[in-house]
Amino acid sequence: AVIRHAHPAAIDRLAADFPDLSIVAAHPGWPWTEEMIAVALHKGNVSWELSGWAPGYFPDSLKRDIKGRLKDKIMFGSDYPSIAYERLFREWRELGYPDALMEQIFHGNAERILGL
């Protein structure tokens, strides 16, 4: 695949063209994490599943926005076996988020967004 097709601008355009479509962006958007944060904040129909990248590598801006402006849009993802579950759970805990936010990230947001 061509990496430019993974740029958050493609998701932004899709979300603008189909405002009633619920879109779940997968992976953290690297190397365009800041742009993906902007798309998730700007588009009400875009949520974000954070698989394929260990939380210990999340940039500070993403860590901050997960507990603030993005708290209702972030979903846990593993991409197992590329990253072991033990490591993922440990690194998520090490971020120090409150239990209520962790419940949102690990299941609450997905249940709401996906209608489960």
Annotated model-derived regions:
Residues 1-75:
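Catalytic pocket-lining loop regions of alpha/beta-barrel enzymes
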Residues 27, 48, 79, 102, ...:
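Conserved, mostly hydrophobic/aromatic
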Residues 30, 81-82:
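Short glycine-enriched loops at secondary-structure junctions
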Residues 70-73, 83-116:
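Mid-to-C-terminal alpha-helical segments outside catalytic/metal-binding sites
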